[in-house]
A protein has these predicted regions:
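Electropositive polyanion-binding surfaces
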Residues: 1-381, 394-421
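Short alpha-helix capping/helix-loop boundary micro-motifs
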Residues: 382-387
Length: 421
């Protein structure tokens, strides 16, 4: 896994580095990106362009046919990309598209090997208990003064990159932990007891078997629950409610593992252009592999505390900003669809009404006063129990877009009918 060596150009405590730490991460909006580092780096000398020599920090892994990393090495290097393939092109190659295969004939065997390895790694991760959430989020684009929400189809080519990045992140984190080096880990603590118990009750009310211990839930408990519901209508909502029951992943100088990935040890190594923790650990790794372990300990032991805390804070702030801007663009998108009717799924139940999600992942609100009858909210069952009709999370309904509120960034629906299963 070859990653651009950004630290060669962004020196520790330099003005560029201080600004990167202050930003913490790149921020992505539908119409623009606020980069962590200048575009001259991200789009220029640190971009692994086709046919150009680039400096890298690489994690070299030798993996056997069972998906086990037999040995690994972290090295500095220079690479020259033969081709810059897109996900679509890789998908076409694997699907046997003759024109694409002919165009990239020199890397066809390599791409096929990557696909073969990914198919080995997937069941290995599943056996560990990785919680593979399938939460659909609207991908909003703003181009040529037009808002679009394309169908974000997940291809196998995406899984290849994801599998290799996760493996590299684990391998690098395990290397640093074994050396007891100062480091920034990516941690994800297990769900707290109260939220796990609430989620367990929700799953049981859906008719699912959920017998895990709320005070000591394991990744495979959640994974098995998802697997048991993958062919049911409530699968999408189960994913979303499961996500809400989990803690937020964050950065820490202390390793406590990663619950969602069922990883004993994890970090972010693969994106130093857009995440400060990656940049920080690249520096530490370079000190160590060049025989300067003592200098790394002296220089970075205190700094990793600051880097982890600031990066976690900035990540949360960036995510909030992205959500707010996305919500505004969704509201603008739905403002042009007043009066249109859609099939939706109830995604939230409150004392004040229902939230419903459309097939393209846009959510709207149905106020309780627009529903017929009187209602009692039963939160532990995610249920709005009425004198005429009751509504619970996961049920399918027919809705109409009534109005939008730009100030609150909210779309209001009218409930037309409950769809009987």
């Amino acid at each position: 896994m070859h990653i651009a060596d950004v630290t060669h150009y962004v020196k520790y405590r330099s003005p560029l580095d201080k600004e990167a730490l202050s930003r913490g991460t790149s921020v992505y909006f539908p119409d623009r990106v606020l980069p962590m580092l200048p575009r001259a780096l991200s789009n220029g000398i640190c971009s692994l362009n086709e046919g150009e020599d680039r400096l890298t920090l690489s994690c070299l892994m030798r993996i056997d046919k069972k998906g086990v990393v037999k040995d690994s090495e972290i090295v500095e290097g220079v690479i020259r990309s033969t081709h810059r393939l897109t996900y679509t092109e890789v998908t076409k190659m694997l699907d046997g598209d003759e024109q694409t295969i002919a165009k990239y004939e020199d890397v066809q065997d390599m791409v096929c090997l990557f696909a073969e390895l990914t198919k080995i790694l997937k069941p290995v991760r599943a056996k560990k208990g990785t919680v593979s959430l399938d939460v659909k989020e609207a991908k909003i684009l703003f181009e040529n003064d037009e808002i679009t929400i394309p169908d974000a189809k997940r291809e196998f080519s995406h899984e290849i990159i994801e599998a290799f990045m996760v493996l590299a992140n684990e391998t690098v984190a395990e290397y640093a932990e074994a050396l007891e080096a100062p480091f920034v880990y990516r941690i994800h603590e297990k769900p707290n007891e109260e939220k796990a118990a609430t989620f367990r009750t929700f799953a049981q009310n859906l008719g699912l078997t959920a017998r895990f211990q709320a005070d000591d839930v394991k990744p495979y408990d959640y994974q098995n629950l998802l697997k048991s519901a993958e062919d049911l209508p409530v699968y999408a909502v189960l994913n979303r409610v499961m996500l809400r029951s989990m803690q937020k992943a964050r950065y820490s100088p202390e390793n406590v593992g990663h619950f969602g990935l069922a990883s004993r040890c994890y970090c972010h190594f693969t994106s130093p252009i857009r995440r400060y923790p990656d940049l920080c650990i690249h520096r530490i790794l370079k000190e160590i592999i060049n025989g300067r372990y003592g200098e790394a300990v002296e220089k970075y032991t205190a700094f990793v505390e600051e880097a982890a805390q600031k990066s976690s804070d900035r990540e949360r702030t960036a995510a909030e900003a992205e959500r707010e801007v996305d919500a505004l663009y969704m509201t603008m998108y739905m403002s042009e669809r007043i009066g249109e009717e859609y099939e939706a799924v109830i995604s939230g139940v409150t004392p004040y009404g229902l939230f419903a999600e459309l097939p393209f992942a846009v959510e709207g609100f149905i106020p309780i006063e627009t529903l017929e009858g009187n209602f009692e909210h039963i939160p532990e069952r995610f249920l709005l129990k009425g004198t005429r009709e009751s509504y619970s999370i996961g049920e399918r309904i027919q809705v109409q877009v009534v109005e939008v509120d730009f100030y609150r960034r909210r779309t209001q629906f009218a409930l037309l009918a409950k769809i009987k299963e």
